[in-house]
C-alpha cells in the first residue's frame, strides 16, 4: 500500500529489476556475485534484483520527481485552486486501483464493473494518471508560491501541504527502520536452500545465497538513503529560493527557471 511513494522517492523499493539502479562500482551485490564460484554465481544471479516491492517486477518506478510532488502538494492545499478536490479524489482513487491484490475486494469489483479496466495488463499501469495530475498540480503550486510576498504567510497558508510532506517523510523513515528489505522471492530462495536434504549441496549454496541477499539489502538501503538525502537537499533549495524571491533578491522569472531546473 506504500508503493505510490515511488512517485516521490524512486529508490524506496529498489527502483527496477536487475542491478542497473546503482553504480556498478558501488554495488555490493555485484561484488558478491563476482567473488562466488562461477557455477554458484550463475545459478544465483537471477535473484540479483534491487526491486523488492509488491508488483513482482518492474522496469522502473513511475517517478514524478521530488520537487514536482512538493509543489503538487502546495497546489492541492491552495484554497484558490478550484480543481484540487476532484484531482485529489482522482489521485487517491488511482492509488487504490494500483494496490491490486493488497486491496483485493475493491479491485475485483472495479475489474468486473469499471469500463476498460480489465484491459490493463497490470493494476500499476493506472499510476500514469496520478503522475500526470501531480505535474499539473505542481504548476498550480509554483504559480501560487511565486506570487507570495510574505514568507510567514506562506508557512501558514500552505500548512496542510507541509504536514502531509512530514507524514510522507515519516512513512519513509518507518519503512527504512522497520523493513527487512528482502523480497518474497529471496525469502523463498533461502527457505528452499534450508530444506535441501543433501548436506554438501546445502552447504555449497547456503552461505553464497545469504551473502548475496545481504549484499542486495545493503544496496537497497543505499538507494533509499540517497533518496532521503536528496529530499532534504531539494527541500532546502526550494525553501531558499522562495525566501530569496519574497525578499526580492531574485525575481519571479529566475525563481520559475530555478524550479524548472530542479524539477
What does each of the following model-derived ranges do?
Residues 1-71, 75, 177-232:
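Periplasmic/ER-lumenal interhelical loops and adjacent helix-loop junctions
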Residues 82-263:
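Contiguous transmembrane helix-bundle modules in multi-pass membrane proteins
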Amino acid at each position: 500500500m506504500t508503493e505510490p511513494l515511488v512517485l516521490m522517492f524512486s529508490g524506496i523499493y529498489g527502483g527496477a529489476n536487475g542491478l542497473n539502479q546503482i553504480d556498478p562500482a558501488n554495488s555490493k551485490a555485484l561484488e558478491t556475485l563476482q567473488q562466488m564460484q562461477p557455477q554458484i554465481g550463475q545459478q544465483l544471479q537471477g535473484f540479483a534484483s534491487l526491486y523488492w516491492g509488491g508488483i513482482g517486477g518492474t522496469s522502473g518506478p513511475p517517478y514524478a520527481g521530488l520537487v514536482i510532488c512538493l509543489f503538487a502538494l502546495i497546489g492541492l492545499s491552495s484554497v484558490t485552486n478550484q480543481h484540487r478536490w476532484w484531482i485529489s479524489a482522482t489521485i487517491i482513487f488511482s492509488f487504490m486501483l494500483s494496490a491490486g491484490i493488497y486491496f483485493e475486494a475493491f479491485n475485483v469489483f472495479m475489474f468486473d464493473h469499471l469500463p476498460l479496466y480489465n484491459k490493463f495488463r497490470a493494476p500499476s499501469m493506472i499510476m500514469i494518471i496520478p503522475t500526470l495530475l501531480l505535474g499539473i498540480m505542481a504548476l498550480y503550486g509554483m504559480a501560487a508560491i511565486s506570487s507570495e510576498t510574505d514568507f510567514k504567510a506562506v508557512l501558514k497558508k500552505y500548512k496542510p501541504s507541509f504536514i502531509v510532506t512530514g507524514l510522507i517523510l515519516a512513512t519513509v523513515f518507518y519503512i527504512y527502520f522497520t523493513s527487512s528489505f528482502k523480497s518474497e522471492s529471496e525469502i523463498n530462495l533461502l527457505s528452499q536452500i534450508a530444506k535441501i536434504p543433501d548436506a554438501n549441496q546445502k552447504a555449497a549454496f547456503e552461505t553464497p545465497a545469504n551473502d548475496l541477499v545481504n549484499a542486495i539489502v545493503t544496496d537497497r538501503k543505499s538507494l533509499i538513503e540517497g533518496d532521503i538525502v536528496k529530499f532534504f537537499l531539494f527541500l532546502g533549495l526550494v525553501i531558499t529560493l522562495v525566501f530569496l524571491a519574497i525578499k526580492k533578491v531574485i525575481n519571479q522569472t529566475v525563481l520559475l527557471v530555478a524550479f524548472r531546473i530542479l524539477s
